[in-house]
Regions:
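Phosphate-binding site of ATP-dependent enzymes
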Residues: 110, 117-121, 128-186
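Conserved residues at the C-terminal ends of beta-strands
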Residues: 52, 106, 185
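Short, hinge-like loop/turn segments at secondary-structure boundaries
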Residues: 16-21, 94-98, 122, 140-143
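ATP-binding N-terminal substructure of ATP-dependent carboxylate-amine bond-forming enzymes
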Residues: 1-76
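A conserved helix-loop-beta module that forms one wall/lid of the active-site cleft
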Residues: 1-9, 56-134
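A generic local structural motif
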Residues: 35-38, 64-65, 90-91, 109-110, ...
Length: 186
């Protein structure tokens, strides 16, 4: 059964979603087929619910994790909603700061300018964005505070630019606290 977070709701004290039954296939180009028209299903009737929700990390995102937290223990939610909610991707990386370039989180333009003076080549990222949206690279010759002002209503992440990013970044996979591997994103 496949649904989008926007299709998740509570009705008559039951967690429900409107979505589609689908069938998985071993075909690289067409790996699933919808097996139903859009229907409403009670998520507690499923043994597992797999949570994979892309940011932006906003109130819709948070609300869906709160709703999934209400499922009975008989329905296992893979990617615990509480853990997902409490582990925002960009801030979670500070648990591994020894692997990070110099990094700043702020909404203060003066502090960003000081960081740029020191690091000389920086990347700015909305803290709760995704998919590369709102990411900007600046050096001392092209810094434009007007671009950043659009994002400074919330703190942003600012990092020293590292050339190795051209080789891609890595997504690390853990299951129940155990490392299972990583995937290069290029």
């Amino acid at each position: 059964f496949y649904y989008n977070p926007k299709d998740l709701f509570i009705k008559e004290n039951t967690i429900q979603a409107s979505g589609y039954y689908l069938e998985l296939q071993l075909d690289e180009k067409n790996y699933f087929n919808f097996k139903s028209n859009k229907i409403i299903a009670k998520l507690e009737d499923f043994q597992f619910v797999f949570l994979r929700q892309d940011p932006p990390f906003d109130m819709n995102y948070i609300t869906s994790t709160y709703i999934l937290d209400l499922l009975p223990s008989s329905t296992i939610v893979v990617n615990d909603p509480t853990a997902v909610r409490n582990s925002t991707e960009k801030l979670f990386t500070f648990n591994f700061k020894e692997f990070m370039p110099p990094t700043l989180v702020t909404k203060d333009l003066n502090i960003i300018e000081e960081f740029l003076d020191k690091e000389e080549d920086i990347v700015t990222k909305p803290l709760y964005g995704n998919g590369g949206e709102g990411i900007h690279r600046f050096d001392k010759s092209n810094f434009n505070s007007k671009i950043l002002e659009e994002y400074l209503h919330l703190p942003i992440m600012v990092q020293k630019f590292i050339n190795e990013i051209n080789d891609g970044d890595r997504r690390v996979v853990f299951f129940d606290g155990e490392y299972y591997g990583s995937v290069a994103r290029i």
